[in-house]
């Protein structure tokens, strides 16, 4: 993503030469610049990971730089070789039968009390059922049933939380924590203050020394709830610290099991970087292996069978969409942009992980195309193009006419048409969904995005290190989040009239915070490599400039604290129960933020896409689950 600044690559006297230069006639000089590779936990260097910068000189004497990134990992032959039989109608029929059976499970909880559901467990049964179908990635089939179950639970919610059942005389930690999390995610007004009930007389969360499985699961629910925190909720911060420590200690004592794996997954990814399809894939592996709900009215085998089927049926759709995406990539002329990173399959994977409803093909493909273009532009502005060429390109983009590309270098002409054709194509899809032309929105986003690049170019040309405030405001735009999100969400079957769009897109708080997370988290992962390339400006360096005497470690601590605060603010913007904008209208912008955050969890997952990102592609797109 656009998370690096632009460096001047040629003097103005070279402009007349650069206009006729080609990206394909280059003489190469290489120098290696070491960069920090992060371990899986982001704590240590990986010696094998390094980044090199290639300096190239075209035949007409223009000096250029190229990032020595690894090539596209997913070639056309590999994509075409993928096979699946889960697109057959018989699998869809089997899934529909299972959907009907799961609906009966939901309905059985609404009938009269019986042996398996009664006044002493009816609340936890409902919450657990909702949580299960959501974690398994099959909740889209049960929207009415989920609402009915949560309405019932909420009707018994109080300032003391809830017990396991409506007639329970004491509050239960597992029921209350899981209820708090689930109700909050669905927009119900529930206060985190209920968690104070589970503290001892010293104001600390209480636990027993034995750490039984029941208690461990309760604390796991507490940890998951604590991640859905809003600004200023001290009890949620305390709950997160306590429960994380408790669970880490529990892992040292309990045997390897589905419970231990579930704890590791939740501690590893939390919530903001635990993408829904990724969570579904992981939860399929551990679901139904415990005995906690053996006396439940919930048939875990049916839920698991449906989850696996749905995962694989969508996998067959992913194959077709990937084939289309690869054809688009080739036909657009993208392979000729040899100076850039080609990560279209990785971007498609991110989109698949946050929107795997079949009807949202336009979103997935639009997101992959848009982010692919942003990344190529990032590399063009960051390393390959000269400042003078980039000024011409930026001005030509604002004219929005193919004839404007006539004055550009050959490689830029191709890039111009890729942007022009793709943006117009996605706008046509958006017009079908929204019933109005959205090109003006798209052009405004692209214009501001490229302007933010040019601002960074001027800073570098003049040697100016901006203040943190200057850098931060410009950097939120140059992060590319708004540009990546706007057009794809408009292709969805979700209405975005102007008054709703302004609460989701610029100038909304939701948009501002989503851009901020990408900027700040990206900087913490990229600033050392950027600095090694001579690109000094980052949130870390600008903060240190504003605060003389502050160490780099202090600056990182400050930025990480900012990220935590921004995440809580973003949670509030999504889930505020008093908001006039439905969660469904905000959810995908929020989830795009989660997807980008995941890519920077350990390292720059776009430049180094052959570790965690490759694993994500294989696990959620390439490989089906075993039935």
Curated annotation (Swiss-Prot):
<keyword id="KW-0809">Transit peptide</keyword>
<dbReference type="InterPro" id="IPR044814">
    <property type="entry name" value="Terpene_cyclase_plant_C1"/>
</dbReference>
<comment type="function">
    <text>Terpene synthase (TPS) involved in the biosynthesis of monoterpene natural products included in conifer oleoresin secretions and volatile emissions; these compounds contribute to biotic and abiotic stress defense against herbivores and pathogens. Catalyzes the conversion of (2E)-geranyl diphosphate (GPP) to (1S,5S)-beta-pinene.</text>
</comment>
<feature type="binding site">
    <location>
        <position position="378"/>
    </location>
    <ligand>
        <name>Mg(2+) 2</name>
    </ligand>
</feature>
<dbReference type="GO" id="GO:0016102">
    <property type="term" value="P:diterpenoid biosynthetic process"/>
</dbReference>
<dbReference type="InterPro" id="IPR036965">
    <property type="entry name" value="Terpene_synth_N_sf"/>
</dbReference>
<dbReference type="GO" id="GO:0010597">
    <property type="term" value="P:green leaf volatile biosynthetic process"/>
</dbReference>
<dbReference type="GO" id="GO:0046248">
    <property type="term" value="P:alpha-pinene biosynthetic process"/>
</dbReference>
<feature type="binding site">
    <location>
        <position position="378"/>
    </location>
    <ligand>
        <name>Mg(2+) 1</name>
    </ligand>
</feature>
<dbReference type="GO" id="GO:0016099">
    <property type="term" value="P:monoterpenoid biosynthetic process"/>
</dbReference>
<feature type="binding site">
    <location>
        <position position="530"/>
    </location>
    <ligand>
        <name>Mg(2+) 3</name>
    </ligand>
</feature>
<keyword id="KW-0460">Magnesium</keyword>
<dbReference type="Pfam" id="PF03936">
    <property type="entry name" value="Terpene_synth_C"/>
</dbReference>
<feature type="short sequence motif" description="DDXXD motif">
    <location>
        <begin position="378"/>
        <end position="382"/>
    </location>
</feature>
<comment type="pathway">
    <text>Terpene metabolism; oleoresin biosynthesis.</text>
</comment>
<dbReference type="GO" id="GO:0050550">
    <property type="term" value="F:pinene synthase activity"/>
</dbReference>
<dbReference type="InterPro" id="IPR005630">
    <property type="entry name" value="Terpene_synthase_metal-bd"/>
</dbReference>
<feature type="binding site">
    <location>
        <position position="382"/>
    </location>
    <ligand>
        <name>Mg(2+) 1</name>
    </ligand>
</feature>
<dbReference type="InterPro" id="IPR008949">
    <property type="entry name" value="Isoprenoid_synthase_dom_sf"/>
</dbReference>
<feature type="binding site">
    <location>
        <position position="382"/>
    </location>
    <ligand>
        <name>Mg(2+) 2</name>
    </ligand>
</feature>
<dbReference type="InterPro" id="IPR050148">
    <property type="entry name" value="Terpene_synthase-like"/>
</dbReference>
<protein>
    <recommendedName>
        <fullName>(-)-alpha-pinene synthase 1, chloroplastic</fullName>
        <ecNumber>4.2.3.119</ecNumber>
        <ecNumber>4.2.3.120</ecNumber>
    </recommendedName>
</protein>
<keyword id="KW-0150">Chloroplast</keyword>
<dbReference type="GO" id="GO:0016829">
    <property type="term" value="F:lyase activity"/>
</dbReference>
<dbReference type="InterPro" id="IPR008930">
    <property type="entry name" value="Terpenoid_cyclase/PrenylTrfase"/>
</dbReference>
<dbReference type="GO" id="GO:0000287">
    <property type="term" value="F:magnesium ion binding"/>
</dbReference>
<dbReference type="GO" id="GO:0009507">
    <property type="term" value="C:chloroplast"/>
</dbReference>
<comment type="similarity">
    <text>Belongs to the terpene synthase family. Tpsd subfamily.</text>
</comment>
<keyword id="KW-0934">Plastid</keyword>
<dbReference type="InterPro" id="IPR001906">
    <property type="entry name" value="Terpene_synth_N"/>
</dbReference>
<keyword id="KW-0456">Lyase</keyword>
<dbReference type="Pfam" id="PF01397">
    <property type="entry name" value="Terpene_synth"/>
</dbReference>
<dbReference type="InterPro" id="IPR034741">
    <property type="entry name" value="Terpene_cyclase-like_1_C"/>
</dbReference>
<keyword id="KW-0479">Metal-binding</keyword>
<feature type="transit peptide" description="Chloroplast">
    <location>
        <begin position="1"/>
        <end position="36"/>
    </location>
</feature>
